[in-house]
Amino acid sequence: MSIPTTQKAVIFETNGGPLLYKDIPVPKPKPNELLINVKYSGVCHTDLHAWKGDWPLDTKLPLVGGHEGAGVVVALGENVTGWEIGDYAGIKWINGSCLQCEYCVTAHESNCPDADLSGYTHDGSFQQYATADAIQAARIPKGTDLALIAPILCAGITVYKALKTAQLQAGQWVAVSGAAGGLGSLAIQYAKAMGYRVVGIDGGADKGEFAKSLGAEVFVDFLSSKDVVADVLKATNGGAHGVINVSVSERAMQQSVDYVRPTGTVVLVGLPAGAKVSASVFSSVVRTIQIKGSYVGNRADSAEAIDFFTRGLIKCPIKIVGLSELASVYELMEQGKILGRYVVDTSK
């Protein structure tokens, strides 16, 4: 298979600096890596944070962002087994991990202190050819629509793992805060597929219609609601058994502590820069609530999330634009104007 020496990519040299759509060299895979011809990549809020550099974790610079890349394997490192040229593969947030530390050996690879992060510490999927550790790369069944599955590789895996973290039972209520965004739109669908009842929370009538079209039974509009907490408590007859916070609003996260049901679980997923959540010790103990963080997922979570998609249970509401338009997608993201998920076509 012919592999070019240069490719189109979006790269930035300083945090917050110009997003340059330009030719850069095609990377060569290390002995343990795949070289993947990325066809499509989802665009995530994490990519925005990586560009801005506003998280307490340094990025590599210069950097090619992106960590929801779906494509075709075009080259194998000399030590790679179990993959073939032409296989479909996905680039996830966890590009690689040590596989030897206490976290890796207990299936918590995302907590590995030496984890290599796509589009953050490792050049990611906003390029036509990208490398990924062969063990961590996601296996995608051949024939899959690569544009539609791209958001599953981070957003889907992340919300699926968060729902597992909430430890709910079929028929129980789960509130999805940030319901109309890229993660929220998938969280609603995974929750329905897992047998849960969904309260979607977001701002705007259009977002309410969108959330309900995906399966939300109830929608609470924080723009028109006089009391979000009271509305959720009423809709769920006592509070949500679980809350999936994919919103990037600190206030929304704080409210979730108050509308979660006694014995329920608040799951924190979204990562607004500098945000904090406080909880009354007395109330937390007496109501027996749990507040947990959930950070992407392991290899098993990834395979399970992809399986839900390939069985037709999850529909990714996407809009496809060219990779060259990435800067405008970031602008829309900052303005909170995105329904579902934007996906970039690396050929444009």
Swiss-Prot record:
CDD domains linked: CAD3
InterPro entries noted in UniProt: ADH-like_C, ADH-like_N, ADH_Zn_CS, GroES-like_sf, NAD(P)-bd_dom_sf, PKS_ER
Gene Ontology MF annotations: alcohol dehydrogenase (NAD+) activity; zinc ion binding
GO CC annotation terms, alphabetical: cytoplasm
Keyword Ligase: no
Residues that coordinate or bind Zn(2+) 1: 44, 67, 154
Gene3D superfamilies, per database record: Medium-chain alcohol dehydrogenases, catalytic domain, NAD(P)-binding Rossmann-like Domain
Binding site for NAD(+): 178-184, 202, 207, 269-271, 341
Transmembrane segments: none
Keyword annotations: Cytoplasm, Metal-binding, NAD, Oxidoreductase, Zinc
Reaction catalysed by this enzyme: a primary alcohol + NAD(+) = an aldehyde + NADH + H(+); a secondary alcohol + NAD(+) = a ketone + NADH + H(+)
Main localization, broad class: cytoplasm
PROSITE patterns to which the protein is assigned, alphabetical: ADH_ZINC
Pfam families, sorted: ADH_N, ADH_zinc_N
Cofactor(s), by name: Zn(2+)
Assembly with partners or alone: Homotetramer.
Free-text function comment from the UniProt entry: Converts ethanol to acetaldehyde.
Family note: Belongs to the zinc-containing alcohol dehydrogenase family.
Protein name (database record): Alcohol dehydrogenase 2
